[in-house]
Amino acid sequence: IIYHGYCADREEAAVRSAEAGVDIDMMTGIYCENLCRLVREGKISEDLINESCMRILELKNKLGLFENPYKDADETKEKEVILCKEHRDLAREAARKSFVLLKNEEKILPLGKEKKIAWVGPYVHSRNLMGSWSFIGDAKDVTNLEEAVKAQADTTNMSFHAGSPMLGSDIRLEGFGEAMEQSTTPEEEEAMLLEAVNAAKEADVVVLAIGEDRLQSGEATSNANIRIPEIQQRLLERVSKVNENVVVVLFNGRPLDLRDVVSKAKAVLEVWMPGTEG
């Protein structure tokens, strides 16, 4: 409400939020920093604070948190339940049902088993598929695209290539207490691109796994340019020039301008940030 111009500063935000009935400040520390002083200065009613406290205490009582403050937290149970086969199967099914086929020209999908396929793009190997708010998710638990393909199909006639970095050289993204750094030289980028182009020339079909990094979506990530990263646009351009049978698998967490993608691909499959089993 400060950034949107409703309040001038953190103190005013504390007053207006409390008066509006917001009982808990989960993230900012604004209540902790200001409420006691504001009560002492007479800028906010102590009765109002007491009412908020009572609502919080009543909720905790209903949830049984006074008798068992840690509720279902159990390290042994967590090891048995988190990432168990049943949950991974559900995660895979949820991902599958979320995919959207945006284009399928000449019914190029599904791909025939006899096809020679080049899997190309930064998302062929990336495990960062969980989205911006998956705080305790660990990328090492994610099945990436190459692993998934090799687990399900005969890969004799397949090859796997990064084609480009996710964003380009000397890039740093920060968000949600995380950071992603990338540093590649122009020579390294050209070598990756050339390898992918050569593979595309030899393939019947190119599956191009491209999109935005997970930290490009979420809070405070507005961008004047909502196309796929420039270096991946270059990859799409070069690959589509040597092979007209391009299938794009698109990874992203927000709406994108896909006009360039759609014009150069025979099929486009939107898979979002598909999660652990995506």
Which stretches of residues belong to each language-model region?
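C-terminal non-catalytic regions of proteins with extracellular/luminal or membrane-system context
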Residues: 1-10, 32-46, 58, 81, ...
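Long, well-ordered, tryptophan-enriched scaffold segments
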Residues: 21-22, 28-69
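Flexible, acidic loop-helix segments that line cofactor/substrate-binding pockets
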Residues: 67-87
